[in-house]
Amino acid sequence: MSGMGENPSDPSRAEPRKRKESIDQLGPSPKRSTEKRNREQENKYIEELAELIFANFNDIDNLNFKPDKCAILKETVKQIRQIKEHEKTAAANEDEVQKADVSSTGQSVIDKDALGPMMLEALDGFFFVVNREGNVVFVSENVTQYLRYNQEELMNTSVYSILHVGDHSEFIKNLLPKSIVNGGPRRNSHTFNCRMLVKPMMECEEEGHDGQETHQKYETMQCFAVSQPKSIKEEGEDFQSCLICVARRVPMKERPVPPPSESFTTRQDLQGKITSLDTTNMRALMRPGWEDLVRRCIQRFHSQHDGEISYSKRHHQEVLRQGHATSPFYRFALSDGTTVLAHTKSKLMRSQTTNEPQLVLSLHVLQREQNMCGLNQDLAGQAMGKTLNPVQSSSPAHQAMYGGNPGQDTTISSNMNYAITGPKEQMGMAAGRFVGSGGMNHISSLQATTPQGNNYALKINSPSQGSPGMGQGQPNSMLSPRHRVSPGVAGSPRIAPSQFSPAGSLHSPVSVCSSTGNSHSYTNSSLNALQALSEGHGVPLAPPLSSPDLKVGNVQHSPVNMNPPQLRKMGSIDSKESFGLYGEQPESAAGQGESGCHSNEQKDCSENLSSVGDQTEGQSRLLDSKGQQKLLKLLTTKSDQMEPSPLPSNTLGDMNKDSLSNFASNSMSASAHGTSLKEKHKILHRLLQDSSSPVDLAKLTAEATGKELSQESNSTGPGSEVTIKQEPVSPKKKEHALLRYLLDKDDTKDNVADITPKLERPDVKVEPTSCPKLLSVKAEKEEPSFGHSDQLMPPGSDLDNLDEILDDLQNSQLSQLFPDARHDGSNSADKQAIMNDLMQLAGDNSTGLPAGAHKQRMIRIQQNNGFSSQLAAQLGRLPNQSLPLDINLQSQVSAGSFPPMRNSAPYTTVSQSVVMNNQAMMGSQGNVSNSSPGIIGVNGPRPALKPGDWGSQASAVRPACPTPSTAINRPIQDLTRSPTASIPMRPGGQVCPRQVLQSPVINMGSSELDMNIGGPQYTQQQAPPNQTAPWPDSILPIDQPSFNNQNRQPFGSPADDLICQPIASQSPTDDGNLLDQLYMALRNFDGLEEIDRALGIPEMVSQGQAVEQESFVSPESNLMMEQKPPLYNHAYANQGQMAQNSYTPMQDPGFNPMGQRPSYGILRMQNRPGLRPTGMVQNQPNQLRLQLQHRLQAQNRQPIMNPINNVSNMNLAMRPGVPGQLREQGPINAQMLAQRQRELLSQHLRQKQLQQQQQQQQQQQQQVQQHRAMMMRGQGLAMPPNMVGSGGIPASINSPRIPQGNTQQFPFPPNYGMSQQSDPGFTGATTPQSPIMSPRMGHIQSPMMQQSQASPAYQSELNGWAQGNPAGNSMFSQQSPPHFGQQSGTSMYNSNNMNISVSMAANGNGMNSMNQMTGQINMTSVTSVPTSGLSSMGPEQKYC
């Protein structure tokens, strides 16, 4: 029943249910509501579960059926089980460190592969691993975002292929094991920066590899590196050297701040011409020097370099072709030496309407690099204005020196400062002496501007450096002679050059360089510049000169200044040319603009210069250097600046101004001083000191003589132009033209300044290497070498002086630089060849030329021959050429500066201009000698000499040998000019002996004078081949022995000089007449050539310096020559010879080696006894001709020797080194020389004995006399026995005193030897080494020093002086005692010599004091000599 009852299908039951349900539904029921709510929640959770189980509803939709609760629950259970199983597996493999995917944080949701890239993205870098070999083991894919390389491209490639080469070392350091890098522990992690190569764009790749290389770009990446990863190491493989890095870009804030850049814009037309300039940005920055920056940038951008088209042209072409262009980076230097890196971006602007190109817009971006210049950068840069190329700017000293070179000059500048400062201090009196003139003031700037960095060492080491002239002259070398100390005061131009030259000084450069210091005369500066160019020395110094600012600044001070018209023309042309030569420099380009314009002439000049430079080995290279270019430019500019004060317009006073302005530091005081001098002296001084060029000299001469300067190419303005034009055509031709002009100009005897033949001298010949155009027009620039010297030197005396100076410079510098070159026998041959060429030219031009002109020409030729030999020895060394020019300048300066001391009155009578020229020449040479060889004492004393001193000495000398002076007036003037300068060198020397020396010099004539000047300076170096060496030899004692060997001159030379001089001094008037006759006879070249052949000059030249020296010695004095050998060969011989040579050397030092470069000469003499013969060689041609004249007069040397013996005192006064000696030597052949030497030896032995006795007796007296002489130094008896010895040989002829001590040395009677023995202190130095102090020079001491040492009394005083003169004194003192002891026999001369020695010592102490001393000593010796040598002194006293 129940079952049935329960059966739902039972109808009876169904109905009641329905009823119940309906009844229940009629009202609310809590039970129903609860059930419903539960169902709803169940469905909701199931849906949520389904969402969790299935990734998305799409998966649900993908199901064939709509998931019900059961399906959802089923899937849920399935996944839960999977998770459980996964957890179990993970737990089994679980490491100590819980895995992220197992972490309860839910990180398992993040894809493991995405985590690395996400981290690299956050770091802004890429990941790479490098093994020990530097190969990339792994690199992340995002490397493409940074380096544009694909992952595959870098995998297994060397990491160094993408690293900048500069970062390889840093990367290796981090890659190597820590134990290898620093030997100590290192953190496993470290950070470093490196530059990585960015793959070029596809476009760049398509352009080609070159383009890629050109456009390589590096991205600076900061690398975080970890080495020695522990986990990897433990895996069994050693990856400890593996580097794991994350590289990221360096944040902007961490990137180095680039140096601030400046920019300005320019607009150019389609032809590249700048139409507008916008410097708004530059002005806004207001950085100092922005105007100069813009100017120099444009100059550099538009200047040509290395024969290529300029940046601007190439850039402009590229812009027109492509529409835009970026120039390569180029550098240039500002005036302060700051180097600027610049590049230019340009775009072609087109018309919007026609699309036609309208203009080019250029943006010049400039970045100033750290100033490379140092010490004097500001000084030099500001003063010079323009600087050299940036590379040159690296040397602040040099820049300061030149002021124009920011770099190169800078280095020299620092040296310069030392050179100027050191030498000044060293010089003491010398510096002070020059300080008086404006020179010292200029020196401060010159320190920055002058290429004296190289000089510094030489200056300090060499007497020349110690000498006032050198010390100050060098600083003033950049300055115009007016502002500069006179050449003599400034010091020997050749010394300064040699100081620079040795380095190459000049290169040097800078020595420029150069050393242009002493050659403050235009010639000297030019020579230094060219010398620096030729030597390549430093003349990077020169480049600064080329800078426009520098140019402007230095033009006024340039010794190279030419006449105003000439300067004006040349100012633009030269500047252009200099720029053309150094067109490479942007600065030079600017300078060109400043000069006036960039003209074709500039190109031509550059070409000429290039060709000329090619001719002169290395000169072209030097010229190519911007520094050299700047130096030449500066020289030229100096000339331009000198324009304001045209030399022709200036009176003799002006000339003196220029020469003395260095002295007085103001042209007015100099002018006043010059005015006090006679017109001839003034002209000579001015020509020597102020004349920037031959044209200037010609102008001055014309003013003095009333002649027109327009006669020849030497005319001031036109002459310069002509010279410029001619020189480019052919240096030789131009020289010939100049020589013709000078010869035709009829250099008056009195007006040595008129003697322009110097323009033709071998200097020019050698100079052909330089552009002829530059030689003359640019001579101001190139003056440093040869052509300019010719231009600078007056047509007559200046040329003669120039020749002598060139010889001296060559001798000094070449010997210093090339000791061997001096000794080359080829020198004589070259000199002879040059002489012949010049003589031929002269002969061609001689027709219609006055005898005087021809003489001058011959002198010049002879000198040129000497110079040529020297140059040949030097093998075309421009520095030597420069040196001669420098010497010439110094001569000029000396004339102004020293002439007052030496030849105010003394030589005024005979031929003041000549004497002055000679004095200036000799003085300059002396100064040069002082500067070059280190005969500081001599140089110093010489400055001490006053015009009055010189005057007294010169006047005394002239009165003593007035006839010779008159007879040989002009020749002597030439010679005297130099000898006079030399004479002051020997303050202790007797005035009379100096006079005697003058007489022989006068007898020798202009040509002889030149020769003598060259010779006396080198008298000890008589060998012509050694002429280049004489100065150097004197400077270099080591060279002396070779010189002694080279020529028997060491002993014979001084004696021969004396002998020759005695011949000349037989009768001043007769000698002068004979000289005139001889010159007239020799007027034509053929005649001269025949005479030379008759005299055996060609053979002598071919034989070499030794032979030439001997020949010269013989002509000068058989006795002297013969005595010389004994002196050199034997100590006693040296004494005797010293006695004679002492006087001769003493005079020679003062006169030639000593006079012009007292200290220098002495040292030179010391350095090589043969130097004097070398000097003699210079004088050789003149001496030979003079000898011919003498022969015409006496037809034999014996009469001459007898007169010399009789006039031994006169010979002393004349000084053996004087041309007279040389003259006699010329005619003497080898046999004669040998015989004379033997005679001299025997005489010397006898004289030595007598001298020793006399010296022993008179040593004390002489010492007292020396003191007196020192006190009397200022009295004007600047001519000590030494001087007397030089000039004393001629005096010897008249005076027996000289033979007393030196008769054996020379043909002079023993009396002469005795008298000269008093001078032996100097003679001793002359006989072996220098004309003045050859005997002592043989010992290494300068002629003056030697002479001083010759007499015991003098020796002691000399020792004292030696103390005063550290450089020359010690040498003097060393040789002085022996010589003095030897010469004690010549009591008179001994006393004189003692005085002279004192004077020499004083010279050691200071040139001025020495010069003063010389005058005093002369008087003292004359007055106090009366001891044993008083009789000998008699004739000299008579002359006095």
UniProtKB/Swiss-Prot annotation:
Keywords: Activator, Biological rhythms, Developmental protein, Nucleus, Repeat, Transcription, Transcription regulation. GO terms for cellular component: nucleus. SUPFAM superfamilies: HLH, helix-loop-helix DNA-binding domain (SSF47459), Nuclear receptor coactivator interlocking domain (SSF69125), PYP-like sensor domain (PAS domain) (SSF55785). CDD domains: bHLH-PAS_NCoA2_SRC2, PAS. PROSITE patterns: BHLH (PS50888), PAS (PS50112). It is found in: Nucleus. Residues 26-83 form the bHLH domain. Residues 625-639 have a biased composition (Low complexity). GO terms for biological process: embryo development ending in birth or egg hatching; intracellular signal transduction; regulation of DNA-templated transcription; regulation of lipid metabolic process; rhythmic process. It holds the Pfam family DUF4927. Its main location: nucleus. Transcriptional coactivator for steroid receptors and nuclear receptors. Coactivator of the steroid binding domain (AF-2) but not of the modulating N-terminal domain (AF-1). Required in a nuclear receptor pathway to suppress expression of dorsal mesoderm genes. May play a role in the positive regulation of the circadian clock. This is Nuclear receptor coactivator 2. The gene is ncoa2.
